[in-house]
Amino acid sequence: MASIDGLPPLREVIRAHGLSAKKQLGQNFLLDLNLTAKIARLAGDLTNSDVLEVGPGPGGLTRGLLAEGARRVLAIEKDARCLPALAEVAAAWPGRLEVLNADALEVDVAARLTPPIRIVANLPYNVGTELLTRWLSSDWPPFWESLTLMFQKEVAERIVAKPGSKAYGRLALLSQWRTDPKIVLTLPPDAFTPPPSIHSAVVHFTRLEAPRHPADPKVLARVTAMAFNQRRKMLRSSLKGLVPDIETVLREAGIEPTQRAEEIPLEGFCALARRLAG
């Protein structure tokens, strides 16, 4: 990458700026520019897209996104220590990188970017699931075209899990209802500085123009929350507070009242949400 953007290797960057990953911010720096370039490529053709990156740290993935031709990158970084390193990246790519020192949970991203928009990020471990849930719960179709996101491997496996598995739950349902998520890369702990105790994985989410099955989002969210908060209980017990005769409603949706949440596919939960909605 240095031959492309003229910037030094990332280990030199963090040494020059005295950067070390902060555990309380969920940081783990990915310093291999070959890997950051690979993640940028996995996001697809960026040449006509604006890109949102959350938690760029010293700018390794940022450099990959710019080198892959992203029209413009908005990098939101909460840690002010990283700003000088990111300013150097911005100087190497004039007019194409905006760095915002802010909490990504508090930024109206859609107002700052021009469609088409892709989100590509090595998400801080402590906010990754919350950010994903927000992006998947917005009005549909959303402001973004695709998501290419790094998570702890355990979280990535929950996203792509199928019914009947221990990993299957609300995150799988929310992800698979309106996107096609796939694990596209797995990374060992020693790819990061400092090495985390777990493996990481990159998930690419392809947006669907409409949900796989019709359902009211709020009703579906309520049903799945109640079902999976007591996932080992039979649905006639975990959902008994929804309506007076939950067993009848379950059967009308094609679900046996003695089944448990982890046995019910997405289509079944959507059918149940439709019955409850009216």
Swiss-Prot record:
A single cellular component GO annotation: cytosol
Gene Ontology MF term list: 16S rRNA (adenine(1518)-N(6)/adenine(1519)-N(6))-dimethyltransferase activity; RNA binding
EC class name: transferase
EC number: 2.1.1.182
Coiled coil segments of this chain: none
Entry keyword annotation includes Cytoplasm: yes
Compartments reported by the entry: Cytoplasm
Keyword check for S-adenosyl-L-methionine: yes
SMART domains reported in the protein's UniProt record: rADc (SM00650)
One protein family per Pfam: RrnaAD
InterPro entries: KsgA/Erm (IPR001737), rRNA_Ade_diMease-like_C (IPR023165), rRNA_Ade_Mease_Trfase_CS (IPR020596), rRNA_Ade_methylase_Trfase_N (IPR020598), rRNA_adenine_dimethylase (IPR011530), SAM-dependent_MTases_sf (IPR029063)
Superkingdom of this protein's organism: Bacteria
Function of the molecule: Specifically dimethylates two adjacent adenosines (A1518 and A1519) in the loop of a conserved hairpin near the 3'-end of 16S rRNA in the 30S particle. May play a critical role in biogenesis of 30S subunits.
PANTHER family associated with the record: DIMETHYLADENOSINE TRANSFERASE (PTHR11727), DIMETHYLADENOSINE TRANSFERASE-RELATED (PTHR11727:SF7)
HAMAP family tied to this protein: 16SrRNA_methyltr_A
Protein name: Ribosomal RNA small subunit methyltransferase A
Gene this protein is translated from: rsmA
